[in-house]
Regions:
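Non-catalytic, solvent-exposed segments at the cell envelope interface
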Residues: 2-451
Length: 451
């Protein structure tokens, strides 16, 4: 990847389009497939055939029912979808700046999230799992039939490595994702119904096929590791630039994976706004180009490969769910006393989040999340009165955000919670208001009205 040394846009002519993130690959691909499905015809049949060719069947890698069979249809029930961005250090992904395959061999689950779609299709909850979380990884079957030893307190992003047995070939994706799926099911104590895998190279192709995305970079970035050098401001990010921003870690915020996940969630929210606003009806050529790139960028479970079978789920998720009812949350974690560079699930908060998904319920009171509008908020306590809403901030930036905070419960009220954990996982009322105002401001001013 060449160094990125850009200047903020000056309302001049710029090629414009839309942007997708590895963590939102499922919705990006399915949005176009659904539109084509609604129009019917040869184009739909051709794309469905291409999509079916990207199916990965993991039944052969089941150990004692680890890879549980799920119903043929998603209709009428809650659904949990695993989305994994792979961190391969070889081939095209390595050329894009992922690293040297001799340094970090094999496939890794660099970005992992679980998308929960409620049974009534009114709510989408997306839980990201930090890659440096220490978890139990079960025994996993390799494609040669051998089985790995189960491990405890292991790095979460080693799950794909163990399943793929250190391999990096296309044939290793199946056993790799099977191991990640089993690990997540063990961690969350719930069934994963479907999965999707995206790699770095595919991520870049998808974004470039869309034309890029407008995004407001909050501060100057100088990151040698990600090869990203960019001023603060409203930018049209290409696939290469967006990938660099996605990978950038130590040069932003506190340098943690948690803060990076938060920035990625902001990018996903920007994608949601752009995707829902795009008019594919008037630009079917652009849609076809994007879909062909997107389909080649992913591998999916058999039930997602049959788009027509589960169209009702996808249509509701992408076309009907209000952005305020889409919630991105990072699994609550804490720093273990024996290793400041790792994380462990923060209990009981982490278990409460997973139980909410398992039982198809709202996120627990006090949970920090980013909504589909890009605002970072806290789940309010319904028993606490809320203040009346303040006027929406104007498009002119002001020194003091005008949004009024929502009263929320303090997660530390739980007698079993560790107060130190709340520092990392809960937002103050002031931050809630500031972030909501910032999200509204960003949506109102980036991209500029003349773009």
């Amino acid at each position: 990847m060449s160094n990125v040394n850009l200047r903020p846009i000056q309302h001049s002519a710029v090629n414009y389009g839309r942007f997708g993130l590895v963590r939102y690959a499922l919705a990006v691909v399915m949005a176009g497939v659904l539109f084509v499905a609604s129009t019917g015809g040869f184009l739909y049949a051709n794309l469905i055939t291409q999509f079916a060719n990207r199916v990965v069947n993991i039944d052969a890698y089941s150990i004692d029912g680890q890879t549980k069979a799920t119903p043929d249809s998603f209709d009428g029930r809650a659904v949990n979808i695993l989305v994994v961005g792979t961190d391969s250090r070889s081939g095209a992904s390595g050329e894009l700046g992922a690293g040297d395959e001799d340094e970090v061999p094999g496939l890794r689950n660099d970005s992992t999230m679980v998308i929960h779609v409620s049974a009534d299709r009114s709510r989408v909850q997306i839980v990201s799992i930090p890659r440096d979380t220490l978890v139990d990884i079960p025994a996993c079957k390799h494609r040669d039939g051998t089985i790995s030893e189960p491990t405890s307190d292991d790095m979460f992003n080693n799950a794909m490595v163990y399943g793929a047995n250190g391999g990096d070939a296309p044939e290793d994706v199946g056993p790799g994702i099977a191991c990640v799926k089993s690990t997540v099911e063990k961690l969350a104590d719930m069934t994963i119904d479907a999965f999707m895998v995206v790699d770095f190279a595919g991520f870049v192709r998808m974004i470039d096929a869309l034309g890029g995305v407008w995004f407001n970079i909050p501060e100057r970035i100088d990151d040698d590791s990600a090869q990203l050098y960019i001023d603060a401001g409203c930018w049209k990010l290409s696939g290469t630039h967006a990938l660099a921003y996605m990978r950038s870690r130590k040069a932003q915020g506190d340098g943690s994976d948690i803060s990076r996940i938060g920035r990625q969630q902001q990018l996903i929210s920007a994608m949601l706004r752009e995707l829902q606003a795009k008019d594919y009806v008037t630009d079917s050529g652009a849609l076809l180009t994007f879909l062909q790139a997107a389909i080649q960028a992913v591998n999916v479970s058999p039930n997602l490969g049959d788009a027509s079978a589960d169209a009702s789920l996808l249509i509701n998720v992408l076309q009907k769910v209000d952005r305020s009812n889409i919630q991105f949350v990072t699994m609550p974690v804490a720093e273990p006393s024996w290793d400041p560079n790792r994380r462990i699930p923060s209990e009981p908060m982490a278990r409460n989040v997973w139980n909410a998904l398992k039982n198809d319920q709202a996120l627990p009171v006090g949970t920090t999340f980013t909504d589909g509008n890009g605002a970072q908020l806290v789940v309010p306590d319904p028993t606490v009165a809320t203040a009346p809403p303040a006027p929406t901030p104007s498009t002119t930036p002001s020194a003091t955000p005008s949004a009024t905070p929502t009263a929320t419960a303090n997660p530390s009220d739980d007698s079993n919670a560790n107060p130190a954990d709340n520092t990392e996982q809960s937002a103050s009322v002031e931050n809630n208001a500031a972030n909501e105002a910032a999200a509204q401001q960003n949506a109102a001013t980036c991209p500029p009205k003349d773009k």
